[in-house]
Amino acid sequence: QWQAFEAGSRAVGSFPSNKLQDGSRIAVIGAGPAGSMFSYFSLKMAQAVGLDLNVDIFEPRKFCHRGPAGCNHCGGVVSESLVQRLATEGIMIPDGVVQRGVESYTLHMDVGDVEIATPLLEKRIAAIYRGNGPRHSELSDTQSFDGFLLQLAEERGANLIPRLVTDVRRDEEKMHVICADSHRDTYDLVVLASGANSRLMEILENQSQEFQSPGRTTTFICEFKLGREVINETFGPSMHVFLLDIPRLEFAALIPKGDYVSLCLLGDDIDDELMQLFFSSPEVANCFPGGFIPEHVCHCYPRINIKAARPTYSDRLVMIGDSGATRLFKDGIGAAYRTAKAAAKTAIFHGVSAADFKQHYAPLCHGIDKDNQVGKVVFGFGSLVQKARFARRGRRRRAPRRSGTRGRTHGPPCRSPRSTRRRRARRSR
């Protein structure tokens, strides 16, 4: 049976062999960014200290498949700072994975639109290809971000096991991983990186009174296929963010990527009523060609982590990424990187007992939790701005506008600065 996470039938860190040794086995459940990065870092660190480990990654999905089998339920936006951090780790993201460099944010409100350039016009964020999610998308040779990270882990020596894990149990000093096809195996450390949409977290919560799975809320993500030329003309190199007075809506954005535009709605349990209010807003329709919102080619209602698991570790068990602690409504990939590296460092250099994770891994999770408390205040202030028209006008006036753009209320579809310059050139002639 599932036993105490931090205290109970065993004292914290009471396992006598809490250090990984040559031949130790690690099971990583989930090959998303968190799971693949943990595998990469743990094998890299183990090699540095001369430790021979066996790392198995359990992942039934294939990221090149169309439809749900290849979908990662994510908007796929990373900051330039994260790209640079990964580069210092030897992880150079291929150009094909980055679908578009985002040069600005376009803020849409009922009082007008404002385009806000990034500092020094640097490309501070990037829209990446997470997987072949759209059901009617064409087969693509483009490598996904998740597939790229998984390949790096495999090149380091990780083994990919295409099985769905349905249970994790402890027996004496070992952990047992049980799969849907009744396959089971024994490991010295289990790393949960299955994400917020996995039922495995609920199963573990039912087995232990000490464990609380991450707090979650329902979101909405969909894809519009418009083609590169139309996207370049109407959306440009900008991420379009909406500040609308819609109850329970905390964040909404249209993100251009290749031939598709991704829509992400985040808030308090997104439902049909909220979505209808959003899609009926003229500010949204005006972003599309002709002021008409086309049918989306796929959609999903993924759950996201809004509160860390309690606790995020136990003897020979650690939870990372969305399974453990992540940033509120943003930078989930960045949090996956931070938690994966911290957990790997703890396991390789310190040990795999609850005491080791409490001392060397838990402080990072607590720090993320504190950041999220501040984030809730910021989002609360944003909700007040959404409700107060005078505040939205003030926000529009104070925004550092980019040259060649102007605020617009219910005007024609939003266009890129390039198309704006072409129209002005035609007028001058």
PLM feature segments, named:
Residues 1-26, 41-54:
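Extreme N-terminal leader/targeting segments of oxidoreductases
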Residues 31-32:
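Glycine-rich Rossmann-fold phosphate-binding loop(s) that bind the pyrophosphate
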Residues 41, 151-286:
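Predominantly flavin-linked oxidoreductase catalytic cores and closely associated redox partners
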Residues 43-71:
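Glycine-rich FAD pyrophosphate-binding loop
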Residues 62-114:
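N-terminal FAD cofactor-binding segment of flavoenzymes
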Residues 74-77, 122-151, 199, 222, ...:
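Short beta-strand to alpha-helix junction loop
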Residues 98, 184, 269-347:
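FAD/FMN-dependent oxidoreductases across multiple families
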Residues 348-429:
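C-terminal helical "tail/cap" subdomain of flavin- and related membrane-associated enzymes
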